[in-house]
Amino acid sequence: MSNAETRPPLPPFTRESAIVKVRLAEDGWNGRDPEKVSLAYTLDTKWRNRVEFANNREEAKGFLTRKWAKELDYRLIKELWAFTDNRIAVRYAYEWHDDSGNWFRSYGNENWEFAENGLMANRFACINDMPIKESERKFHWPLGRRPDDHPGLSDLGL
Protein backbone atom coordinates (compact mmCIF):
# COMPACT_ATOMS: atom_id res chain seq x y z
CA MET A 1 0.00 0.00 0.00
CA SER A 2 1.63 3.27 -1.07
CA ASN A 3 1.21 6.54 0.81
CA ALA A 4 -0.93 7.83 -2.06
CA GLU A 5 -3.37 4.99 -1.37
CA THR A 6 -3.51 5.68 2.37
CA ARG A 7 -5.92 8.20 3.89
CA PRO A 8 -5.47 8.48 7.68
CA PRO A 9 -6.92 8.16 10.16
CA LEU A 10 -7.23 4.45 9.46
CA PRO A 11 -9.71 1.95 10.88
CA PRO A 12 -10.37 0.65 13.42
CA PHE A 13 -11.64 4.02 14.63
CA THR A 14 -11.62 5.49 18.10
CA ARG A 15 -13.97 8.32 19.02
CA GLU A 16 -11.13 10.79 18.49
CA SER A 17 -10.04 9.39 15.12
CA ALA A 18 -13.66 9.20 13.91
CA ILE A 19 -14.14 12.89 14.77
CA VAL A 20 -10.99 13.71 12.79
CA LYS A 21 -12.21 11.61 9.83
CA VAL A 22 -15.56 13.44 9.83
CA ARG A 23 -13.90 16.86 9.91
CA LEU A 24 -11.55 15.91 7.07
CA ALA A 25 -14.55 14.82 4.98
CA GLU A 26 -16.36 18.08 5.78
CA ASP A 27 -13.28 20.11 4.82
CA GLY A 28 -12.93 18.24 1.55
CA TRP A 29 -16.54 18.72 0.53
CA ASN A 30 -16.44 22.40 1.50
CA GLY A 31 -13.53 22.75 -0.94
CA ARG A 32 -15.91 21.70 -3.75
CA ASP A 33 -13.16 20.15 -5.90
CA PRO A 34 -14.58 16.91 -7.41
CA GLU A 35 -11.15 15.59 -8.44
CA LYS A 36 -9.60 16.12 -5.01
CA VAL A 37 -12.65 14.87 -3.09
CA SER A 38 -12.95 11.74 -5.24
CA LEU A 39 -9.45 10.64 -4.16
CA ALA A 40 -10.82 9.95 -0.65
CA TYR A 41 -12.84 7.03 -2.11
CA THR A 42 -11.80 3.58 -3.31
CA LEU A 43 -11.66 2.97 -7.07
CA ASP A 44 -14.70 0.68 -6.72
CA THR A 45 -16.59 2.86 -4.21
CA LYS A 46 -20.36 2.37 -4.03
CA TRP A 47 -22.64 5.33 -3.35
CA ARG A 48 -26.32 5.95 -2.93
CA ASN A 49 -27.07 9.65 -2.71
CA ARG A 50 -30.82 10.27 -2.55
CA VAL A 51 -31.91 8.23 -5.59
CA GLU A 52 -28.65 8.50 -7.52
CA PHE A 53 -26.08 5.71 -7.53
CA ALA A 54 -22.34 5.72 -8.22
CA ASN A 55 -20.46 2.47 -8.73
CA ASN A 56 -16.86 3.68 -8.85
CA ARG A 57 -14.64 6.70 -8.22
CA GLU A 58 -15.17 8.17 -11.70
CA GLU A 59 -18.96 8.06 -11.32
CA ALA A 60 -18.65 9.65 -7.87
CA LYS A 61 -16.51 12.43 -9.37
CA GLY A 62 -19.16 13.02 -12.05
CA PHE A 63 -21.84 13.17 -9.39
CA LEU A 64 -19.86 15.76 -7.40
CA THR A 65 -19.27 17.86 -10.53
CA ARG A 66 -23.02 17.97 -11.23
CA LYS A 67 -23.85 18.58 -7.57
CA TRP A 68 -21.63 21.63 -7.13
CA ALA A 69 -22.69 23.08 -10.49
CA LYS A 70 -26.28 23.09 -9.15
CA GLU A 71 -25.76 23.75 -5.42
CA LEU A 72 -24.13 27.18 -5.42
CA ASP A 73 -22.33 28.83 -2.48
CA TYR A 74 -22.34 25.42 -0.77
CA ARG A 75 -21.42 25.36 2.93
CA LEU A 76 -21.51 22.12 4.93
CA ILE A 77 -21.28 21.09 8.58
CA LYS A 78 -20.93 17.39 9.51
CA GLU A 79 -21.18 15.86 12.97
CA LEU A 80 -20.22 12.39 14.17
CA TRP A 81 -23.27 10.34 15.13
CA ALA A 82 -21.79 6.87 15.72
CA PHE A 83 -18.78 4.72 14.83
CA THR A 84 -17.40 1.20 15.10
CA ASP A 85 -14.32 -0.50 13.68
CA ASN A 86 -14.41 0.57 9.99
CA ARG A 87 -17.78 2.35 9.92
CA ILE A 88 -18.87 5.90 10.72
CA ALA A 89 -22.35 7.44 10.76
CA VAL A 90 -22.74 11.21 10.45
CA ARG A 91 -25.50 13.74 10.39
CA TYR A 92 -25.07 17.00 8.55
CA ALA A 93 -26.63 20.12 7.16
CA TYR A 94 -25.56 22.28 4.27
CA GLU A 95 -26.82 25.54 2.82
CA TRP A 96 -26.83 26.46 -0.84
CA HIS A 97 -28.82 28.30 -3.47
CA ASP A 98 -29.87 27.48 -6.98
CA ASP A 99 -29.21 29.59 -10.08
CA SER A 100 -32.46 31.51 -9.44
CA GLY A 101 -31.28 32.63 -6.00
CA ASN A 102 -33.56 30.29 -4.01
CA TRP A 103 -31.88 29.22 -0.76
CA PHE A 104 -32.08 25.79 0.83
CA ARG A 105 -30.85 24.03 3.93
CA SER A 106 -30.36 20.35 3.25
CA TYR A 107 -30.38 17.92 6.17
CA GLY A 108 -28.88 14.48 5.86
CA ASN A 109 -27.47 11.33 7.36
CA GLU A 110 -24.70 9.23 5.89
CA ASN A 111 -23.35 5.79 6.62
CA TRP A 112 -19.72 5.26 5.67
CA GLU A 113 -17.65 2.09 5.40
CA PHE A 114 -13.88 2.29 5.00
CA ALA A 115 -11.24 0.04 3.49
CA GLU A 116 -8.14 -0.79 5.56
CA ASN A 117 -6.24 2.04 3.84
CA GLY A 118 -8.72 4.66 5.09
CA LEU A 119 -10.42 5.26 1.74
CA MET A 120 -14.20 5.21 1.82
CA ALA A 121 -15.58 2.11 0.11
CA ASN A 122 -19.32 2.67 0.70
CA ARG A 123 -21.34 5.85 1.19
CA PHE A 124 -25.10 5.78 1.71
CA ALA A 125 -26.84 9.16 2.06
CA CYS A 126 -30.40 10.24 2.84
CA ILE A 127 -31.04 13.97 2.36
CA ASN A 128 -34.00 16.34 2.58
CA ASP A 129 -34.02 19.89 1.21
CA MET A 130 -35.84 22.64 3.08
CA PRO A 131 -36.41 25.98 1.35
CA ILE A 132 -35.23 28.87 3.52
CA LYS A 133 -35.13 32.63 3.17
CA GLU A 134 -31.70 34.14 2.73
CA SER A 135 -32.24 35.86 6.10
CA GLU A 136 -32.62 32.39 7.73
CA ARG A 137 -29.14 31.25 6.74
CA LYS A 138 -26.85 30.17 9.58
CA PHE A 139 -23.67 29.36 7.62
CA HIS A 140 -21.93 32.61 6.69
CA TRP A 141 -18.22 31.85 6.66
CA PRO A 142 -16.25 32.59 3.46
CA LEU A 143 -16.46 29.75 0.94
CA GLY A 144 -14.14 26.88 1.78
CA ARG A 145 -13.22 25.29 5.10
CA ARG A 146 -15.47 26.08 8.07
CA PRO A 147 -13.46 28.08 10.62
CA ASP A 148 -12.51 26.18 13.77
CA ASP A 149 -14.40 28.67 15.95
CA HIS A 150 -17.64 28.38 13.94
CA PRO A 151 -20.41 26.55 15.85
CA GLY A 152 -21.25 22.98 14.90
CA LEU A 153 -24.71 21.54 14.26
CA SER A 154 -25.59 20.89 17.89
CA ASP A 155 -24.34 24.35 18.90
CA LEU A 156 -26.60 25.88 16.24
CA GLY A 157 -29.62 23.90 17.41
CA LEU A 158 -29.74 21.95 14.18
Show where each model-derived region lies:
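Charged/polar, solvent-exposed surface patches and flexible loops
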Residues: V20, L24-D27, L39, G62, ...
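Hydrophobic alpha-helical core bundles mediating ligand binding, dimerization, or RNAP-core interactions
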Residues: V22, Y41, L64, Y92-Y94, ...
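A solvent-exposed, acidic/Ser-Thr-rich amphipathic alpha-helical stretch
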Residues: S17, P34-I88
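Short, low-complexity N-terminal intrinsically disordered segments enriched in polar/charged residues
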Residues: M1-L43, L153-L158
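A beta-strand edge to alpha-helix "cap/lid" segment located at domain peripheries
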Residues: S2-F13, W68-L158
